[in-house]
UniProtKB/Swiss-Prot annotation:
Keywords: Calcium, Cleavage on pair of basic residues, Copper, Disulfide bond, Lipid-binding, Metal-binding, Methylation, Phosphoprotein, Repeat, Secreted, Signal, Zinc. Belongs to the ALB/AFP/VDB family. This is Albumin. Residues 19-24 form a propeptide. Cu cation binds at residue 27. Interacts with FCGRT; this interaction regulates ALB homeostasis. Interacts with TASOR. In plasma, occurs in a covalently-linked complex with chromophore-bound alpha-1-microglobulin; this interaction does not prevent fatty acid binding to ALB. Gene3D superfamilies: 1.10.246.10. The modification Phosphoserine is found at residues 29, 82, 89, 296, 442, 512. The modification Phosphothreonine is found at residues 107, 443, 445, 569. It holds the Pfam family Serum_albumin. Residues 1-18 form the signal peptide.
């Protein structure tokens, strides 16, 4: 990259980076401005999401009261922006409403202490009390009951969905949740007319649930990236992702969008849901206004209403890679001015490297592209301090190859394991692997994470080679972030803490490299995990699997160096025991009689 060209790029980037694409007009009343922009229904939905994400234990009706109060106040401010309190910040208005809740101390304990603080510390305090794993009842869809509720009051049904999802997922991307709530109501509009409501509803609800959980995990990773590694981490991720999706867009267009996309996510992660949704709509408009310069795939998205438009843009397929792109080596390895360009503006130069690499490689995972950029940066830091920098960095692309080979080999190996054993067997192999790596982690967390990791086989292994790596690596990033979020709340393993905090892009390789934790002191054998009753016979298959996998984790915590053969023997005995007693006439009597024998045979097998 010649010096004159690079300076032009730097000036363009600096301008785009500072300007972004949003109008940033000031308004006398922020709440009136957002109410006017968003409309009453979206305003109410977003306020309900915000309160539900902060006050996760409050009943729905209490939240509805808070939403009504704030909506009426917003309408007052729309009518007269100079009305008392209309000039207050949204944080102040929301915080004041939260602090009015009579049962705040009783229900949330020291969260009530937040109310003694001033903004912005008060909002930060509320954010810190969000619970990623709240103790809430499992939702079980009953088609007839749900259809009756839907027909009785569609608006309330929509609100109840927002409330139930938001309080279970306190970082859910709010404008996306509005989109899913509308889709959810649409499913009931269709299926409640059907003769067999359950046959129509349940598969659609299950499919939507998977999408909603994936959306929640993606946003939780974005928020964790900002919280733990700063905006730069999310910007780098977004540059790689958008460069893959919009490979014909130029670097300055990509960085403009990245700057404001980061602002949108930062707002939502920070609880500023009204600003987040409003800015996201503006960003979607900008992208559609400039679609010809960005991607041929956007047209279908841009004809949709605002919530569907934003969702469609986020999910849009990658555009075709432009033909005749020059080789990467020309600007980033062969050019003798690389160090000059890098030292003049490191982030711009590395950003352009990431952009150029990503747009040429839609088949790579974002996390892999970020590892390539990180190692390229480390190489330049080393080489640019030497007497002959060019001789040092000229072969850098050969040195980067291992970062692509490592995940490809790992995926091949794990997909072979999945194809041999199926999803449940693959999950069990991962339970053994991860319990040995981090036996201090709680049993429910190890089971949850291993089951989720095991689903990567079903999700990704059947995909074509060009899609396997992004599917696998990016999915694993979400699951490992969940482990890190849960572990941060109650840290028990130094190894897990190290992998979670040292490097966002190297989390997966760090966990892959962990071995048996030799510092762990095995726990005593606990009979309760091998004591069962007749109720296990009527459990759904998934819950039966979880019972067995819980026992497997506990076995490993008792005997982390147990051989695969020992574990196989114990688990086969366990399955035979359950099958025998579930087939018996007196099931409970069988469990009482045979249970102690299972405990004895298990202890003998592990001796």
């Amino acid at each position: 990259m010649k010096w004159v060209t690079f300076i032009s790029l730097l000036l363009l980037f600096s301008s785009a980076y500072s300007r972004g694409v949003f109008r940033r007009d000031t308004h006398k009343s922020e709440i009136a401005h957002r109410f006017n922009d968003l409309g009453e229904e979206n305003f109410q939905g977003l306020v309900l999401i915000a309160f539900s994400q902060y006050l996760q234990q409050c009943p729905f009706d209490e939240h509805v009261k808070l939403v009504k109060e704030l909506t009426e106040f917003a309408k007052t401010c729309v009518a007269d922006e100079s009305h008392a309190g209309c000039d207050k910040s949204l944080h102040t208005l929301f915080g004041d409403e939260l602090c009015k809740v009579a049962t705040l101390r009783e229900t949330y304990g020291d969260m009530a202490d937040c109310c003694e603080k001033q903004e912005p510390e008060r909002n930060e305090c509320f954010l810190n009390h969000k619970d990623d794993s709240p103790d809430l009842p499992k939702l079980k869809p009953e088609p007839d009951t749900l259809c009756a509720e839907f027909k009785a009051d569609e608006k309330k049904f929509w609100g109840k969905y927002l409330y139930e999802v938001a309080r279970r997922h306190p970082y859910f991307y709010a404008p996306e949740l509005l989109y899913y709530a509308n889709k959810y109501n649409g499913v009931f509009q269709e299926c409640c007319q059907a003769e067999d409501k359950g046959a129509c509803l349940l598969p659609k609800i299950d499919a939507m649930r998977e999408k909603v959980l994936a959306s929640s995990a993606r946003q939780r990773l974005r928020c964790a990236s900002i919280q733990k590694f700063g905006e730069r981490a999310l910007k780098a991720w977004s540059v790689a992702r958008l460069s893959q999706k919009f490979p014909k867009a130029d670097f300055t267009d990509v960085t403009k969008i990245v700057t404001d996309l980061t602002k949108v996510h930062k707002e939502c992660c920070h609880g500023d849901l009204l600003e987040c949704a409003d800015d996201r709509a503006d960003l979607a408009k900008y992208i559609c206004d400039h679609q010809d310069a960005l991607s041929s795939k956007l047209k279908e998205c841009c004809d949709k209403p605002v919530l569907e438009k934003s969702h469609c843009i986020a999910e849009v397929d990658k555009d075709a890679v432009p033909e005749n792109l020059p080789p990467l080596t020309a600007d980033f390895a062969e050019d003798k001015e690389v160090c000059k360009n890098y030292q003049e503006a490191k982030d711009v130069f590395l950003g352009s490297f990431l952009y150029e690499y990503s747009r040429r490689h839609p088949e790579y995972a974002v996390s892999v592209l970020l590892r390539l950029a990180k190692e390229y940066e480390a190489t330049l830091e080393d080489c640019c301090a030497k007497e002959d920098p060019h001789a040092c960095y000229a072969t850098v692309f050969d040195k980067l190859k291992h970062l692509v080979d490592e995940p490809q080999n790992l995926i091949k190996k794990n997909c072979e394991l999945f194809e041999k054993h199926g999803e449940y067997g693959f999950q069990n192999a991962l339970i053994v692997r991860y319990t040995r790596k981090a036996p201090q982690v709680s049993t429910p967390t190890l089971v949850e994470i291993s089951r989720s990791l095991g689903k990567v086989g079903t999700k990704c292994c059947a995909k074509p080679e060009s899609e396997r790596m992004p599917c696998t690596e990016d999915y694993l990033s979400l699951i490992l972030n969940r482990l890190c979020v849960l572990h941060e709340k109650t840290p028990v393993s130094e190894k897990v803490t190290k992998c979670c905090t040292e490097s966002l892009v190297n989390r997966r390789p760090c966990f892959s490299d962990l071995t048996l934790d030799e510092t762990y002191v095995p726990k005593p054998f606990d009979e309760k995990f091998f004591t069962f009753h007749a109720d296990i016979c009527t459990l759904p298959d998934t819950e039966k699997q979880i019972k067995k996998q819980t026992a497997l984790v506990e076995l490993l915590k008792h005997k982390p160096k147990a051989t695969d053969e020992q574990l196989k023997t114990v688990m086969e005995n366990f399955v035979a025991f359950v099958d025998k007693c579930c087939a018996a006439d007196d099931k409970e009597g069988c469990f009482v009689l045979e249970g102690p024998k299972l405990v004895a045979s298990t202890q003998a097998a592990l001796a």
